[in-house]
Amino acid sequence: MAITYDTYEDLWEHSEVLEGVHEVLSEVAEVDGVPAISEAFLRGIDEDRGHKHVVAMNGDRVAGVLAIDPDRVIELAVAPEVRHSRVGIALFEALRDQLGVSGGIDVWAHGDSAGAQRFVESLDARRTRELLKMSVDCPPATKAAKAMEAGGAEAEKRCAEQDFEVLSYTESVARFDADSVDAEWVRINNEAFAWHPEQGGWDVDYLRSARDTNWFDPDGVLMLWVRDENSAAERVGIPCAANGGEGNDDVFRLVGFHWTKIPLEEKEKDAGERTGEVYVVCLADDARGRGLGQAITQLGMKSLLENGCGRIELYVEGDNAPAVSTYKRLGFEVVHTDVVYRGRL
């Protein structure tokens, strides 16, 4: 039976196709040992995020899917049983011929398998970005877990000695208010990630959309605050007086945060068997060089341990040598590499 290729600008509205797409994505992840589609692109499949899609159909069964976002970044998956049958190439041809996409494109290869490398070579693509997945095993009562607990306690002490206050997102909103806290969150995020293609340039609406997931836990976001007594006319932060503080010259500034993640399916596992993630670690420019980046990382890891995680994972840019070095000191090892290849249609 010939494989056909259908295009969608509203895939999320086609429930019968969505079911087949998710089935093939599950099969690909099981066979390859790594998901072919990232969290952001999964959301682009299930809801309107401006993504377009090409779906390969082998009769009534989904045989592959290609997704492209508004920035011309592409992710795709091909069912194991139809690999080496030009399905991947045909998905790109349909993207060009049916959706009219041509010119430069960036293609993610999650896991960067030998098959993926051969495929992108056929597109005359070059390697432009590496994203490392690192992990550390830390079951309860093991040496690694005890070291993390001790590191977290030391981090709490280090923050207190420098007059920084660690509050969860829940506690921060109770102390101040949601709009002010979210504004500070976005300010610090964009300052730290001005260079980042996905993490930078956020606004409050985008932040709230990013938090709108089944796994988000406001107590899993640790925020580092400092009381600023600087009397300069132009300052950022949250005025103390507006929130029950004393005086009009003080503000609380956010200087960093650690957004941790425990997927919903992991929360259903027994304590000690869950996998958590160092999801986003962020530090203000003027707070660097004081050991706070490692401290807030350790605080989040301690929180993940306390919430039953026996393994912790993270993703980091391959060319971010200081961060990779820090994570290795904390016991993390590289387990696989995701790669972006740049080519042309």
UniProtKB/Swiss-Prot annotation:
The keyword Transferase applies. One of its GO terms (molecular function) is mycothiol synthase activity. Transmembrane segments: none annotated. PROSITE patterns: GNAT (PS51186). Its EC number is 2.3.1.189. Acetyl-CoA 1 binds at residues 76-78. 1D-myo-inositol 2-(L-cysteinylamino)-2-deoxy-alpha-D-glucopyranoside binds at residues 39, 198, 261, 277, 315. It catalyses: 1D-myo-inositol 2-(L-cysteinylamino)-2-deoxy-alpha-D-glucopyranoside + acetyl-CoA = mycothiol + CoA + H(+). HAMAP family: MshD. Catalyzes the transfer of acetyl from acetyl-CoA to desacetylmycothiol (Cys-GlcN-Ins) to form mycothiol. Monomer. This is Mycothiol acetyltransferase. It comes from Corynebacterium jeikeium (strain K411).
